[in-house]
Amino acid sequence: MLQQFTLLFLYLSIASAKTITGVFDSFNSLTWSNAANYAFKGPGYPTWNAVLGWSLDGTSANPGDTFTLNMPCVFKYTTSQTSVDLTADGVKYATCQFYSGEEFTTFSTLTCTVNDALKSSIKAFGTVTLPIAFNVGGTGSSTDLEDSKCFTAGTNTVTFNDGDKDISIDVEFEKSTVDPSGYLYASRVMPSLNKVTTLFVAPQCENGYTSGTMGFSSSNGDVAIDCSNIHIGITKGLNDWNYPVSSESFSYTKTCTSNGIQIKYQNVPAGYRPFIDAYISATDVNQYTLAYTNDYTCAGSRSQSKPFTLRWTGYKNSDAGSNGIVIVATTRTVTDSTTAVTTLPFNPSVDKTKTIEILQPIPTTTITTSYVGVTTSYSTKTAPIGETATVIVDVPYHTTTTVTSEWTGTITTTTTRTNPTDSIDTVVVQVPSPNPTVSTTEYWSQSYATTTTVTAPPGGTDTVIIREPPNHTVTTTEYWSQSFATTTTVTAPPGETDTVIIREPPNHTVTTTEYWSQSYATTTTVTAPPGGTDTVLIREPPNHTVTTTEYWSQSYATTTTVTAPPGGTDTVIIREPPNYTVTTTEYWSQSYATTTTITAPPGETDTVIIREPPNHTVTTTEYWSQSYATTTTVTAPPGGTDTVLIREPPNHTVTTTEYWSQSYATTTTVTAPPGGTDTVLIREPPNHTVTTTEYWSQSYATTTTVTAPPGGTDTVIIREPPNHTVTTTEYWSQSYATTTTVTAPPGGTDTVIIREPPNYTVTTTEYWSQSFATTTTVTAPPGGTDTVIIYESMSSSKISTSSNDITSIIPSFSRPHYVNSTTSDLSTFESSSMNTPTSISSDGMLLSSTTLVTESETTTESICSDGKECSRLSSSSGIVTNPDSNESSIVTSTVPTASTMSDSLSSTDGISATSSDNVSKSGVSVTTETSVTTIQTTPNPLSSSVTSLTQLSSIPSVSESESKVTFTSNGDNQSGTHDSQSTSTEIEIVTTSSTKVLPPVVSSNTDLTSEPTNTREQPTTLSTTSNSITEDITTSQPTGDNGDNTSSTNPVPTVATSTLASASEEDNKSGSHESASTSLKPSMGENSGLTTSTEIEATTTSPTEAPSPAVSSGTDVTTEPTDTREQPTTLSTTSKTNSESVATTQATNENGGKSPSTDLTSSLTTGTSASTSANSELVTSGSVTGGAVASASNDQSHSTSVTNSNSIVSNTPQTTLSQQVTSSSPSTNTFIASTYDGSGSIIQHSTWLYGLITLLSLFI
C-alpha cells in the first residue's frame, strides 16, 4: 500500500511539473576578460561574462517546473562547473545545467529546474553570470559554417531567448589583427569531448592555385589525429576572424595517420582557398606542438615552400578531468524538431565511460522542385523513428538578364540583383578592363605544346608565348589573278597540317555559255599550257520559273520577273492590291488556339477565323449604390481571364469612431454577409488641443470643447464673465488723446486709461467779502478751455521781507499773507461760496462744510556778497482757526531756514533774471538745511451744530512732530540757443506724528449717482505721510513783436496719483505698506527747458483713522455697486516724492522780438500702499481733490507759484478732476492750500521752499 502511494505521489509530481518561460527577463551586461593573453577582443576568445536578470514568481512557478535559456552562436561555457544555482538572499530557488553546443549544435543551452524553496508566497529575482565563448566558425563542419556568419566586426546585437521572451544587448567585437592573405591557423578546445579542433588555411593566391601540399603532424607522439573527423574543402571567403564561411569540394589526395594528415591538390580556381581541419587528442590539450606543411604554387607564379611549427597553449578547463576516462558521443533519434545535447548519468568512481548523447530529430530527405516565381513553399511528409521524413521544397527560380560592363578593378565580379516582386533578375558582370595582349607562336623541338603568359601591370601589354611542335605539310598549286607566282604557307593550329599554296598567274580564258536540252548544266574547260588560252564551255539547262502572288499597299497590280543565275529559279512576282478582310473569333473545346485564313481571289474578301480555348473565369462580388443585384461578365482577350462581376446592393453600415492611446489611426471594417449590416470601427489618435479664453455677457463661466475631425485640433473655449472695469481719464503732455485698456486676469478688474491733451486755462481773479481766499476751477470737456476763478479776501496781511537785491523781482506786501486751508469731512463740506446741504438716499448722510483759515507770517532775509553768492534766511509761522467752532485748532510752526546760492554771473538773490538783450549763462547750486518743529492741538475742528455725526469727531488729537529736512540742490546749465536750468534736489524727511483724519465728504454742487452698496464699515487705521511742495518758477523778460518785452505764460501742471499695491480685503489686514512716490514733471515749450528732479524719502509712523470716501466740489461722482468689508488695518506708509520745476527762457518772436512761451505741465504722481490710486488733473489756480492747488498770473511780475499739498489717500480708485470718480472704499481727506499776495499776484518761492512747504502741509 505504501509503495502504491509513493508511486502515485511520484506520478502526480511528474504530471504536475510544467515548462515555464520568461524567467530570464533582462540582459544586464556582456563584458570580456582576457583569459590567455589574446591579441584582440574576438567573440570566440574566452571569456565573455554575460550577466542576466531572472525572476521567479511562486504564484505561477512550482517546484519541479523547468525553463530553458537558448543562446544562439554560443560555442561553450568556459568554466569547470556543470551547473549554476539561481540564488537570492542565500536561498537556491532553481538549479541550471550547462549544455555547450560546441560542434554539435549552433547554440548552447541553460536548462533549469525550480527547487522546493520556491513557495507560492515568494517572488524571487536576481542576476546570474555565465562565462561563455561565442562560435564564429573554425572548422568546415555545418555547425561552424552556419555560426561563422553570426557576427561581424564592430557593434553587434547578441540575443538570447527564454521561450518567447527575447533578451538582447549590444556589444563591440574587434576584428582579427592577423593578415588574412597569409597562411591561417586556429585551434579550439571542446571540453565535452576532451579534444581539440585544429584548422589550417592555405595562403591566398589571387589567380588560383596550380598545385600544393598542406597538412600538419606531430613528431613527439603526444598528439593523435582523429582521421574520422576531418573536413577538407575550399572556401570562397573568410569572415572578420579569418574562418571559412563556405566549403566546396575539389580535387585532392589525402593521407591520414594518427601522427598527421596531408593533402595534395591542384587546379584550384581563383577566389578560393584550400583548408583542412581535424579533431586531435593530446596528452595535454592545453599544451602541444604541431608541424605544418605549407607548399603551394600560385597560378602564373613559382612554387613556394614555407613550412612552420606552432606550439599551442591555452587555458586549462577542469572539465577535462585527469582520471583518464573515455568520453563517447552517441546519437539518438527523437521526435523533437530540434537537436539537443545531454550527458547520461555518470559515476566517476564506478563508470569508466562518460557518454554524451546527442538527441537528433528524425532525419529528413529534401526533395527540391522549382518553378518560375518569387516565393518558396515547404511541405513535409512525416515518418516514424527509424525512417526518413521527406521535405518537399518548391523553390522559385528567376530567369536572368546579364549586363556586362568593364571596370578599373583587376578581377571579374558578378552581382545578381534579385527582383523581390518579379521572376526576372539582373546579373551585373563587371569585367576588368583587359590589358592589350600580344601573342607570339613559335615552334620548338619538343613534341608537345606550351603556352606562357607574361602579365604586365594594369595598363601595360600582356604577352602570350605559344610554343608548338612542327606540323605536317601539304602543297597545293593554284592559279590566281596576279601576273606573278607566289608561294604561301598556311599554318594550321598546332597538331594539324600546314598547307603550302603555290599561286600561278592564270592563262587567258575564253568562256562560252549555252543552253541545251538536258536538265543539268555542264562546264568544260580546255586547259592550255601555262601562258596559253584556256577555253571554258558552260552548258546550262533552262531555269525553272516560280510565280508568286502577293498583296501590297497600292491600289493597282504589277508583275515583276526576277531572273536567277543559270541553274537557279526565275521568280515571277505578281503584286495585287489587298483584299478586304473579315475576322471572326470563336471559342472551341480544344486547349490551344488556331488561326485560319480563307483567302478569296484578288478583289474579293478574305476571311480570318480565330479559334480560342475558353478563358479562365474569376468571380468578384462587390457592393454598389443600387438597391438590386446584377451579374456582369467582362470577357478578357483570348488567353486572359474573364471576370464575372456580381454587384450586390450595399449593406447598411454602422460607423463607430473612438480615440485610443496610439499615435496613428486605424480603420477596421467588419463585413457582414450581403443583406446584413457592416461595422466600420475607426480608431483615431487623440487630437491636439488649443485653449482659448474669452469674455461674454453672462455672469458665470463655462467651458466648451469644440471637437475637430480626427487629425485636427480640438478647441477648448473658456468663457469668463466680464471683469469689472475702472475708467481713469488723465491729462498728459501730448497733443492727442489715447485710450489704453489694461486687462486683468479673469475675476480681476480691468482698467481703462484715457489720456487727454491738457485744456487751455483762463484765470480770473476777483475780490469778495469773505475773510479767506478760494479758487474755483470750471473744467471744460476735453479740448475746451478751463476757467480758474480766484476769489481774494479784502482783509489785511503783513509780510516782512528783508532783501538787499530781490526787491526788483518780489514786491513787498501791504496786507496779511493768508493760506486758505479747507478740510472736508463726512458731515460738512464747503467750497467757495457754495453751502448747499446734500444728502445721499442710500446712506442717509448729512453733508455740510467747515472752513479752517490759516494765517501765516513769513520772514525772509537775503544777503549777497560780491554778486557771486547769496544767503537767505527765512522763517514762517501760522495759526489755523475755525470761525464756526467754539474751540480753535492752533498750529504753531517755527521754520528757520538757511540757504546758500551761487552762480557764475552776478544775479539777484540767486535767481537769474535777464533783459531782452541778455541771456544768463549761470548755473545755480543751492544747499539748504531746514529744521521744523510743530506742536498742534486740535480739540474739535468741526461745528457742534451738526448733531447727527458729532461723535465721529469728538475725540481730540494732539500731534507733536519734529522733523529735520536737508535739501541739496546742484544746478547745471544745459542750454542750447536758449539757456535753461537743471536742478537736482534730494530731500530726506523723518517724521513721527499722530493724526486723526476726518471723514471725507462730497460737495453740495456734486452730481452724484448712487447705486446700492453693501458696506460693512469697520475702523481703519492708516499710518501716512503727506507732503506739500511749493515750487518757484522764474520767467525772464522776452521781447515782443517789435522788440518790446511781453510775457505769455501758460502753466498747466498735471498731478497724477497712483498706488503701488493692489487693494483687496486681505490687503487691509497687513501691518505696514510702502507708498507715496510723487513725481512732478513739466512739459515745456521748444524754447525753454528746466528739469528739476527731487527725491523725497519720508519715513512716517502715524495711526490714522480713515472713514468713508468723499469727493470735492466740481466733481462728477459715480458709485459702483460693491460688496466691501472694511476691517481694521494699520498701514505704515513711506512716501517718496519727485518734484520738477520749470523756468521759461527767452523765445524769439516771429517779428524778431523775443516772446517766451511757457507751457508748464507738471505731473505729480503719488502712490500709497493702502491699495488704491487716485489720478487728478491740476489746472493752474485750481482746486484738486487729494492733490494740490496751483495759481499763476500773466502780468509782468515774472513770478509764478505752485503749491502742491498732498493729503492722505487711502483705498481710492483712480480719479480725474474733470471725469468721474469711482469709489467703493474709504476715500481721500482733502486738504487744499493756496498762497497769494493779496493783490492777485502769486508769491514766488524757490525749489527748496517748495519742498519745505510740502513738509509743513503735514502738520498745518
Swiss-Prot record:
Induction: Highly expressed in biofilms with down-regulation during later stages of biofilm formation. Expression is repressed by TPK1 and SFL1, and induced by TPK2. Also under the control of TOR1. Down-regulated by Riccardin D, a macrocyclic bisbibenzyl isolated from Chinese liverwort D.hirsute which has an inhibitory effect on biofilms and virulence. Induced by caspofungin.
Bridged cysteine pairs (disulfide): 73-150, 96-112, 205-298, 227-256
Membrane topology annotation: Lipid-anchor; GPI-anchor
Keyword entries, A-Z: Cell adhesion, Cell membrane, Cell wall, Disulfide bond, Glycoprotein, GPI-anchor, Lipoprotein, Membrane, Repeat, Secreted, Signal, Virulence
Annotated stretches, region: Disordered: 896-924, 954-1226
Keyword field contains Signal: yes
Any single Pfam family the record assigns to this protein: Candida_ALS
Lipidation (GPI-anchor amidated glycine): 1238
Domain notes per entry: Each ALS protein has a similar three-domain structure, including a N-ter domain of 433-436 amino acids that is 55-90 percent identical across the family and which mediates adherence to various materials; a central domain of variable numbers of tandemly repeated copies of a 36 amino acid motif; and a C-ter domain that is relatively variable in length and sequence across the family.
PTM annotation, UniProt: The GPI-anchor is attached to the protein in the endoplasmic reticulum and serves to target the protein to the cell surface. There, the glucosamine-inositol phospholipid moiety is cleaved off and the GPI-modified mannoprotein is covalently attached via its lipidless GPI glycan remnant to the 1,6-beta-glucan of the outer cell wall layer.
UniProt organism field: Candida albicans (strain SC5314 / ATCC MYA-2876) (Yeast)
Protein family per UniProt: Belongs to the ALS family.
InterPro entries: Adhesion_dom_sf, Agglutinin-like_ALS_rpt, Agglutinin-like_N, Agglutinin-like_N_N2, ALS, Fibrogen-bd_dom1
Listed name of the protein: Agglutinin-like protein 1
Glycosylation site list: 471, 507, 543, 579, 615, 651, 687, 723, 759, 820, 886, 918, 973, 1045, 1068
Role played: Major cell surface adhesion protein which mediates both yeast-to-host tissue adherence and yeast aggregation. Acts as a downstream effector of the EFG1 regulatory pathway. Required for rapamycin-induced aggregation of C.albicans. Binds glycans and mediates adherence to endothelial and epithelial cells, thereby playing an important role in the pathogenesis of C.albicans infections.
Signal sequence annotation: 1-17
MF term (GO), any: laminin binding
Any single GO BP term: intracellular copper ion homeostasis
Residue spans of biased composition, Polar residues class: 896-918, 964-979, 1002-1062, 1073-1090, 1111-1154
Residue spans of the ALS repeats: 365-396, 401-432, 438-469, 474-505, 510-541, 546-577, 582-613, 618-649, 654-685, 690-721, 726-757, 762-791
